[in-house]
C-alpha cells in the first residue's frame, strides 16, 4: 500500500531544497507527497513548480520581533496548530517530516497531537529553537552536522540532502585548473551586501589574474557589475545561478556565507572555500556550520568584522599562487561530505512508517 509523507519546510532554500530532495526520492518509490508551508514565502511557488500539492497555515516567527508580536504569539500559534490539524485530518499522512521553517512548529505539534509519527531534520550545526522544542515530541531527530543535539538512540547524523548533480561532480583533482584563479562568489538568494561591496575592490587589489563569477542576489546586478567595471575587473555577475553544479565545477575557490545548504554543497562539490558567516544569524549557527569544514582543513574562516578589501585581497593573492593548497582543501571537503543524505532521510521515513523505529526504541 502506498504511503503518504507530509513535508514541513519553507522560508528559505536551505529548508525547501533538502525537503524536495527527500520528496523526489520517496515519490520515485511510490509515496504520495504533500507539503505544509506559508503562503507568503518561497515554498508557495517553488513546491507546486516541482509538482507537489501544498497547504498553507498562518504563522510568523516570534524571536526578536518586539513585545506586541510576542503578546499575540500564543493566539497565533494555537490558531496555526488547529489549521495544521485540519490539514492532517484531510491528508492522513503516515509520517510528518519537519525540515525547518515557520510551518514546522505548529505542524509538528499538530502531528504529535494527532498521533502521527514526527521525524525532524536539523540542517544547521546549532539547533534552532523550534527543533529544540519539537525534539521532545519527535520519534526521531536527524542532524546534518554532529553536535546539534546530544547523541542518543533517537538521534542520528545523516548530512544535508543536496542536489544530485552536485554530488555527481567529478573528483576535484580532475577539475583543478591552471591560472588564472577561478573565483565564485555566492551571496544567497537575497545576496550578501558585504560581499557585493568588498569583493570587487579586493579582486582588483589582489594583484593576480582572477576570473570571477558573482551571484549577487535579486536587484543587485547593475550595482555590482558597475563596481567591477570601475575596478577594471571583468566579471560575470548574475542575480541567481540556475546551474550551481556547473558553477562549483568551474570554481577553484568559493567565497560565500555559511548557510547549512551552502556548506553542505561546498563539501559535496569538493571545492575550496572562504566562509564569511552572517554575523547576526540566530544562535550564530553560520559560524558553527562553517567550522565543520574549517576544522577539517577544507575551508578558511573570515569573520565579517575582519573582512576588508585588504584582508580579502591578501587571502586571494596567497591562495592564487598555491594550487596544491586549493586542491588539498577541495579534497578535504569531499572527505567530510555526506553525499547520500537524501537517501538516509528517506530511509528513516520508511522505517518510521513501517513501525521499525518503534520496535528498535
Curated annotation (Swiss-Prot):
Single annotated GO MF: UDP-N-acetyl-D-glucosamine:N-acetylmuramoyl-L-alanyl-D-glutamyl-meso-2,6-diaminopimelyl-D-alanyl-D-alanine-diphosphoundecaprenol 4-beta-N-acetylglucosaminlytransferase activity
Enzyme class at the top of the EC tree:
transferase
Q: How does it sit in the membrane?
A: Peripheral membrane protein
Name the pathway.
Cell wall biogenesis; peptidoglycan biosynthesis
Keyword check for Nucleus, yes or no: no
Where does the source fall among the domains of life?
A: Bacteria
Binding positions for UDP-N-acetyl-alpha-D-glucosamine per the UniProt entry:
12-14, 124, 163, 189, 241, 260-265, 286
Q: Which Pfam families does this one have?
A: Glyco_tran_28_C, Glyco_transf_28
InterPro entries noted in UniProt: GlcNAc_MurG, Glyco_trans_28_C, GlycoTrans_28_N
Q: What's the EC number here?
A: 2.4.1.227
CDD domains attached here? GT28_MurG (cd03785)
Catalysis: reaction(s) = di-trans,octa-cis-undecaprenyl diphospho-N-acetyl-alpha-D-muramoyl-L-alanyl-D-glutamyl-meso-2,6-diaminopimeloyl-D-alanyl-D-alanine + UDP-N-acetyl-alpha-D-glucosamine = di-trans,octa-cis-undecaprenyl diphospho-[N-acetyl-alpha-D-glucosaminyl-(1->4)]-N-acetyl-alpha-D-muramoyl-L-alanyl-D-glutamyl-meso-2,6-diaminopimeloyl-D-alanyl-D-alanine + UDP + H(+)
Q: Which UniProt keywords apply?
A: Cell cycle, Cell division, Cell inner membrane, Cell membrane, Cell shape, Cell wall biogenesis/degradation, Glycosyltransferase, Membrane, Peptidoglycan synthesis, Transferase
Q: Where in the cell is it found?
A: Cell inner membrane
Q: Name one GO cellular component term.
A: plasma membrane
In the record, biological process GO terms are: carbohydrate metabolic process; cell division; cell wall organization; lipid glycosylation; peptidoglycan biosynthetic process; regulation of cell shape
Give the protein family. Answer: Belongs to the glycosyltransferase 28 family. MurG subfamily.
**Which PANTHER family does this UniProt record tie to the protein?**
GLYCOSYLTRANSFERASE, UDP-N-ACETYLGLUCOSAMINE--N-ACETYLMURAMYL-(PENTAPEPTIDE) PYROPHOSPHORYL-UNDECAPRENOL N-ACETYLGLUCOSAMINE TRANSFERASE 1
Supply the HAMAP family for this chain: MurG (MF_00033)
Q: Main role?
A: Cell wall formation. Catalyzes the transfer of a GlcNAc subunit on undecaprenyl-pyrophosphoryl-MurNAc-pentapeptide (lipid intermediate I) to form undecaprenyl-pyrophosphoryl-MurNAc-(pentapeptide)GlcNAc (lipid intermediate II).
**Protein name, per record:** UDP-N-acetylglucosamine--N-acetylmuramyl-(pentapeptide) pyrophosphoryl-undecaprenol N-acetylglucosamine transferase
Q: What is the source species?
A: Aeromonas hydrophila subsp. hydrophila (strain ATCC 7966 / DSM 30187 / BCRC 13018 / CCUG 14551 / JCM 1027 / KCTC 2358 / NCIMB 9240 / NCTC 8049)
Amino acid at each position: 500500500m502506498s504511503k503518504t509523507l507530509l513535508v514541513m519546510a519553507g522560508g528559505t532554500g536551505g529548508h525547501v531544497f533538502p525537503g524536495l530532495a527527500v520528496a523526489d526520492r520517496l515519490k520515485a518509490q511510490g509515496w504520495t507527497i504533500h507539503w505544509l508551508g506559508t503562503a507568503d514565502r518561497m515554498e508557495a511557488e517553488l513546491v507546486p513548480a516541482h509538482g507537489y500539492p501544498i497547504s498553507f497555515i498562518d504563522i510568523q516567527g516570534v524571536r526578536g520581533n518586539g513585545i506586541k508580536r510576542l503578546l499575540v504569539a500564543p493566539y497565533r500559534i494555537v490558531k496555526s496548530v488547529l489549521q495544521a490539524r485540519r490539514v492532517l485530518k484531510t491528508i492522513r499522512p503516515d509520517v510528518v517530516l519537519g525540515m525547518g521553517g515557520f510551518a514546522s512548529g505548529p505542524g509538528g505539534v499538530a502531528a504529535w497531537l494527532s498521533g502521527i509519527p514526527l521525524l525532524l531534520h536539523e540542517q544547521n550545526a546549532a539547533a534552532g529553537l523550534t527543533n529544540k522544542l519539537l525534539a521532545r515530541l519527535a520519534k526521531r531527530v536527524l542532524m546534518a552536522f554532529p553536535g546539534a543535539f546530544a547523541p542518543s538512540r533517537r538521534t542520528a547524523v545523516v548530512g544535508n540532502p543536496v542536489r544530485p548533480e552536485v554530488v555527481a561532480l567529478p573528483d576535484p583533482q580532475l577539475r583543478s585548473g591552471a591560472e588564472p584563479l577561478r573565483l565564485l562568489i555566492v551571496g544567497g538568494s537575497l545576496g550578501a551586501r558585504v560581499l557585493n561591496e568588498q569583493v570587487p575592490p579586493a579582486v582588483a587589489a589582489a594583484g593576480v589574474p582572477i576570473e570571477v563569477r558573482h551571484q549577487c542576489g535579486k536587484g543587485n546586478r547593475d550595482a555590482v557589475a558597475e563596481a567591477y567595471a570601475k575596478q577594471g575587473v571583468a566579471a560575470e555577475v548574475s542575480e541567481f545561478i540556475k546551474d550551481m553544479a556547473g558553477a562549483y565545477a568551474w570554481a577553484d575557490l568559493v567565497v560565500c556565507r555559511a548557510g547549512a545548504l551552502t556548506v553542505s554543497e561546498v563539501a559535496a562539490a569538493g571545492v575550496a572555500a572562504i566562509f564569511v558567516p552572517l554575523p547576526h544569524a540566530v544562535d550564530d549557527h553560520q559560524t558553527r556550520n562553517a567550522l565543520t569544514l574549517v576544522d577539517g582543513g577544507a575551508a578558511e574562516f573570515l569573520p565579517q568584522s575582519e573582512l576588508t578589501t585588504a584582508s580579502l585581497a591578501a587571502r586571494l593573492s596567497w591562495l592564487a599562487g598555491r594550487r596544491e593548497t586549493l586542491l588539498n582543501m577541495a579534497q578535504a571537503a569531499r572527505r567530510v561530505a555526506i553525499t547520500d543524505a537524501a537517501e538516509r532521510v528517506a530511509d528513516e521515513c520508511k522505517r518510521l512508517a513501517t513501525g521499525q523505529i518503534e520496535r528498535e526504541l
